[in-house]
A protein has these predicted regions:
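Catalytic-core segments of class I nucleotidyltransferases/pyrophosphorylases
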Residues: 42-114, 120-123, 127-128
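Conserved beta-loop-beta/alpha segment of the NTase-like Rossmann-fold superfamily
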Residues: 1-33, 38
Length: 128
């Protein structure tokens, strides 16, 4: 994971549903994105396609390890859709939604999230 989230911003007591995705709001298109329904539950998750302002942090929760394993095997066996030639976790959440799973997010304040994915981002973080 190439993201640092300040201490206290992510709490296991928030975890609920079949899946849970910590998010923050940011610019750009190099994220996975989450769209919520009118009740605040996840309605859609897309990799590298901006469907809302909610960007995933790259940390993901599934209710059980077995659920993750089952989703991975079923999705990539039936629908091996790759994004830029790579496998991502985001499509597993969309697949979980198609199986009537419930997924929630947390919305972490952007100033508490420090992206470290490039040398420039790391340098900026170290200088702060």
């Amino acid at each position: 994971i190439d993201t640092y989230v300040e201490s206290g911003e992510m709490n296991s007591t928030e975890l609920k549903g079949d899946g849970f995705i910590p998010c923050f709001q940011a610019e750009g298109i190099h994220w996975s994105f989450v769209r919520l329904d009118e009740k605040g539950k996840v309605a859609e998750v897309k990799e590298k396609k901006r469907i809302s302002n909610y960007c995933t942090l790259g940390a993901y929760y599934f209710r059980t390890c077995q659920l993750y394993r089952d989703l991975y095997e079923a999705y990539y066996r039936k629908k091996p859709e790759l994004v830029n030639g790579e496998k991502y976790v985001a499509p597993l959440y969309d697949y979980l939604l198609s199986q009537n799973g419930e997924i929630y997010i947390s919305d972490i304040a952007p100033e508490k999230v420090h992206v470290l994915g490039t040398p420039e981002e790391l340098k900026r973080f170290l200088e702060e």
